Amino acid sequence: MKEKIRKKILLAPEEPGVYIFKNKGVPIYIGKAKRLSSRLRSYLNPQTEKVFRIVEEADELETIVVMNEREAFILEANLIKKYRPKYNVRLKDTNFYPYIRISDDEIPYVEIVKRKLRDGTYFGPYTSVQFVRNLLEILQKIMGFRTCKSDLKRIKRPCFLYHLGRCTGPCIGNIESHGEAVRRLKEFLSGNMEEVFDYLKEKMETHSRMLDFENAAKYRDLLLNLSNVLESQGVVFEESISCDVLVHAHDLFVVLRVRNGYLVGKISFEMEGGNVEDFIREYYVSGRGDIPKTLILESDLDEMDYSSLGFEYVGPPRSTTEEDLLEKAKKNLENELKMRGLRKEALEELMKLLNMKDFPYRIEGIDISHLQGKYTVASLVVFEDGFPKKSDYRRYKIEQDHPDDYESIRTVVKRRYSKHPLPNLLFVDGGIGQVNAAVEALKEIGKDCPVVGLAKKEETVVFENREIKLPHDHPVLRLLVQIRDETHRFAVSYHRKRREKESLRSVLDSVPGIGPIRKKKLIEYFGSLENIRSASLEEIARVIGSAEIAKRILDVL
């Protein structure tokens, strides 16, 4: 420890605050304390390897005095978020979790995003993108908030969503009704769902009393669909409870998010060397997750009154329902730990089998899909620590005159790894020919990486021009089959979309009166020929603004 650091520690103030160890002006560790003097004196006699490294590397110590522990906690969280010091524990997402963002524009729009920034009102994170899409679709039908990002001042007439009754039309002056739609959406996503359910029930009953059974059925269906979307998360509690439940073991943290009696998400994070207080700082105080009124833990936290941060209660269960939720969270945690144990075992076996130097933490998988050489596409999927990392998935469109899987693989490998770092292991769906094509492509760009394949016939592992036959229940084979199936699924889904869009373009080109703008609208709205075939004349006419041309389209189809 440098002498000037020792002197600063001995002169540290008694007040609460934040301390920052720096090396060459860069923060390497940031901490908080009720009493800076007491906390910093513990660094004079390091008890762990981490503390020893901090004091050995630091050439500067800065302290910031604040009024109370709450201010220290928030300041610590903000500084860690800003500087990301290397010795502070970090929260690592084990999956990609979506947020719902309401923009901060004068007339806001609503969208699904991957990251939480300071540019609007955010809700989440949620467990599934599909769940969020389904939820927003039904809520938009009920409320009519806008999802377009268009400059409203330049719009002369409303889009098809307005004509379908899914948008209030702020672009044509319906500002107040749109503001009300956004308010109701915020209330709903904050957990106050009763207002929307009561509104739908009232509308259904009113139309029923008026013998307007068509509209009564419409609101009944909206009510049922909304309930079904929420229940699709798997758990509904009789009591209208809203809370988060946090459990952890080792470096893994699991949070169950319950809003108004519905389980809206289960999320898991890794935090090496972190405790519950670290998690609250990294997840809630730094703004990654909404602060709920109630946070259920396995035991009390003694150090701080978290109500000053926005929580009304932080602690162990107070009711049978909360106890049940805690048990559910524990079971989810046990399952996550079990899965991680199995995946780690499979990865270790894979490392031994292929005689790899590095642990295969990141595996990238490639597959090619085409139809007799047409509409060729490639998928690239990513597995980290044995689990899919969907936010890193990529798709590639390949132009070629004749079908050639080997050349397609070479093309994708060169495009990908000329610009991106290599994974620990590259997986290719195929046998020796496909694997060799990937190896050759890497050599052409001066790169080297282990490449493994899985031959479709008898599911044989292919590596370095040799075939390895494994028992069907071998953990390595199960892992490689999962990666193979995921690359195939992702490639086929992209190929299908490309084929359908190309077919749709081809048909639309033959319809008189369909120019580039109308063609783009039809493709964006319907996506496939099948969807247009099943649409009504009125719906197609609303999209393109012409009943006559809509009739021509249906005649061609």
Swiss-Prot record:
This protein's record includes keyword Disulfide bond: no
Main location: cytoplasm
GO cellular component term, pick one: excinuclease repair complex
Pfam families in alphabetical order: GIY-YIG, HHH_5, UVR, UvrC_RNaseH_dom
GO terms classed as biological process: nucleotide-excision repair; SOS response
Keywords noted in UniProt: Cytoplasm, DNA damage, DNA excision, DNA repair, Excision nuclease, SOS response
Role played: The UvrABC repair system catalyzes the recognition and processing of DNA lesions. UvrC both incises the 5' and 3' sides of the lesion. The N-terminal half is responsible for the 3' incision and the C-terminal half is responsible for the 5' incision.
Entry protein name: UvrABC system protein C
Gene: uvrC
